[in-house]
Each structure stands twice: as C-alpha cells, then as structure tokens.
C-alpha cells in the first residue's frame, strides 16, 4: 500500500485595492455633540482626514471653531476581513505623517490658550500646531510615524471605516 500525494491548492484571501477607494469622501454635520463635519481624501498612498469642529450650540455646522488634520501615508490595503458591523471588508495599514490642530477664530484661540489645550499656550488663529504625541484631553495622541491599523469596506457611493465606525459619502 503506497502513499499517494494529495494535490493541494492554496487559495489566498482577496486583497483590497487603493484605486477602489481613491478620491474624496465626506461625512455631513453630525447629529450629536460635538458637532463635526469630516472629509477624507485618498490619493496614491496618502490618506488625509480633516475634521471641522463646531460649537455645542451650532447644530447646523455653520461656523467651525477649529480643524483637526490627520495625514496618514504608506497606505497598504490588506486581505479580506470581517468588520465590526458584520460585513466583509479589508485591512488597511499606514503610518501617521501629521496630526495637527488649527484654531479658526479668536474666541477659540483664546479658550485654547487659557486651557493649555494639548499642553500648549501659544495657539494662534489660523496657525496649525502639531499635536502628535500630546494629550488633548482623550489620552496621548499617537506619535508621528507610528503604525496605524484599520479596516474598511466600500461601495461606489460610500466608504466605511471600521475604527471610527463612520460611513463617508463619495464626492464628485
């Protein structure tokens, strides 16, 4: 009785493609405090998330108080994964290139300086400040060049990011 070799085939999991999610995606004014609007731009291996933050009484998102910019680079889509919402998507790794805050009016700037926001008291209106590695009230922010892991799914009209559990709409 001889041993027969069994033919085996290895099937690799599908891998995501950056070209599928390239472009501009946005999330309109949130319905809960803090009121925010977000825009995601994905081009090449770069992913930029810009958040405009509004006042507690500005539910229409009329006048932004400050902006937060997170720029990730070296985007690498990975294999297919099950996301927290039980849909299928893909893993995504990147490195943090920029994490900054910009106060957009004098009142916000004064408040940030009085409260030593992110440990800083030299905020200036419309001037961007790096806040990577600093504590801005929710624990220490990631440091520059730190690896970031997320998962995503998409349709032709929307992009879902698993880490934030937010869905962004495709912009023309």
Q: Model-found features: residue ranges?
A:
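Tryptophan-anchored aromatic micro-motifs
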Residues: 10-38, 168-169
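Beta-strand residues in well-ordered beta-sheet regions across diverse protein folds
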Residues: 50, 162-163
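Contiguous, well-ordered beta-strand patches that form the walls/edges
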Residues: 28-35, 52-156
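Short, solvent-exposed coil/turn segments at beta-strand boundaries
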Residues: 21, 39-48, 149-159
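N-terminal Sec signal peptide cleavage junction
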Residues: 1-5
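Intrinsically disordered, low-complexity regions of eukaryotic proteins
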Residues: 6-9, 88
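Short, low-complexity, Pro/Ser/Thr/Gly-rich segments in the mature regions of secreted, periplasmic
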Residues: 164-172
């Amino acid at each position: 009785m001889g041993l027969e070799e069994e033919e085996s085939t290895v099937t690799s999991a599908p891998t995501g493609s950056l070209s599928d999610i390239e472009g501009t995606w946005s999330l309109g004014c949130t319905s809960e405090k803090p009121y925010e609007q977000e825009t995601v731009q994905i081009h090449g291996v770069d992913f930029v998330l810009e958040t405009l933050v509004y006042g507690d009484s500005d539910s229409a998102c009329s006048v932004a108080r400050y902006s937060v910019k997170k720029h990730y680079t070296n985007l690498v889509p990975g294999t297919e994964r099950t996301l927290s919402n039980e849909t299928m998507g893909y893993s995504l790794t990147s490195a943090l290139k920029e994490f900054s805050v910009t106060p957009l009016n004098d009142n916000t700037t004064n408040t940030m300086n009085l409260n030593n926001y992110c440990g800083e008291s030299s905020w200036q209106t419309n001037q961007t400040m790096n806040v990577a590695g600093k504590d801005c009230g929710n624990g220490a922010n990631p440091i520059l060049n730190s690896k970031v892991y997320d998962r995503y799914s998409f349709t032709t009209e929307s992009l879902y990011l698993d880490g934030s559990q937010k869905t962004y709409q495709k912009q023309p």
